[in-house]
Amino acid sequence: MTIDGDVHEISPFFQVRQTKWGGRACFSNGNIPKGTTVLQVSNFTGTSISYEFRKEVCHNCFAYANAKTMKYKLNYDYLRDLVCNAHYQINPKKFLGAGLWFCSEHCRTSYLQIPNIIELIECYEILLHHFPSMLKRYNYTSEQEEKLNSILISENVIQSSWDEIESKWIPRINNMKSAKRINQLPPTCEDEYCCIRFVCESLFNLKYMDPQCITYRAFNMLQSNELSKISKFPVLLHFQKLVFQTLYILLPSHLHRMLSIPLLRHILGTEYGNAFGLWQEGEASDSREYFGYWVFPEASYFNHSCNPNITKYRKGNSMLFTMNRDIKKDEQICIDYSGVLDLPTVKRRAFLADSWFFDCACERCKSELQSVH
């Protein structure tokens, strides 16, 4: 049976169903020939370009400049028509470019034509303005990180930590004047900066997304891997709180209204295990650059197989999922999560367990394990 009407309409080629062995999977609606693109998605909830690539990757089409800085930035002149008479926290004389770079005039123009994009640009600009001082104060030692990673994580530990933010930290911040709030910004490194931008974009996209659209409904139903991920890396709980605190202090009112602890936890919890890598196009898998990640809720219902019948690839700012062989009706449609299919069975399964929190039981793994024993 299908699990829910909310994700039944993802593709005419397959249905998302509850499996006999637990969990969800995609099953073909009919015979599908090799070469058929069963899903093409461009409605991501959020993207994150790694800090080291922020100037070398186009923020619209994700083209890569081969270690060269993109030629097209934003200056305030491009925003005049977007700002109009509305009150945005963008200083014409001190505009930094919002941390956005583009490969062409076309991509810059396309990005600026996104409805209400000035709101996201404002958030990026505010963050970029404060980031240098936050980074300057970032001095976590390996001993401090080791201490944070030594915490024994449970659902209660995570919940208690957020309860303290809600009951103590938020009321204290709310009672401060704006200038004093800024002094409460936590020290932040490059990884947190990129994650904050990812959450900003996710909040922005969710704000203007039709709640009845398939992307929104699929996002709400995504499985959170919060407990599994933080249990493995307890420092992430501290990381998440820094992200929330920064957003709570800096976000302008139009996106601040979207921010809540449950939504932030769902955004980050579903990113763990559901994000797709942003990879360089047109290069062999062993030589292409990894730029960051993005989340496509509709594409997150494919299960993994070490012998996948789908090949996934990026085309500009879209992801395509194409059959690499013929399949029959009711056959499960699977992708490769790992990119390590050439590894020996034991190492491959260990990598999947560490990275995606499941013990692979695909037909290839079962067959190879039987031959070993």
UniProtKB/Swiss-Prot annotation:
GO biological process: methylation
Cross-referenced Pfam families: SET
Keyword Amino-acid biosynthesis annotated: no
Domain SET, residue spans: 12-338
EC code: 2.1.1.-
Gene3D superfamilies: SET domain (2.170.270.10)
GO cellular component: nucleus
One GO molecular-function entry: methyltransferase activity
CDD domains in alphabetical order: SET_SMYD
Keyword annotations: Methyltransferase, S-adenosyl-L-methionine, Transferase
SMART domains: SET
PROSITE patterns: SET (PS50280)
Listed InterPro entries: H3K4_H4K5_MeTrfase (IPR050869), SET_dom (IPR001214), SET_dom_sf (IPR046341)
Keyword Methyltransferase: yes
Family: Belongs to the class V-like SAM-binding methyltransferase superfamily.
PANTHER family: HISTONE-LYSINE N-METHYLTRANSFERASE SMYD, POTENTIAL PROTEIN LYSINE METHYLTRANSFERASE SET6
Protein function: Involved in resistance to compounds that target ergosterol biosynthesis, including fenpropimorph, dyclonine, and alverine citrate. Since a deletion in the absence of these compounds does not have an effect on growth, is more likely to be involved in compound availability.
Name this polypeptide is given: Potential protein lysine methyltransferase SET6
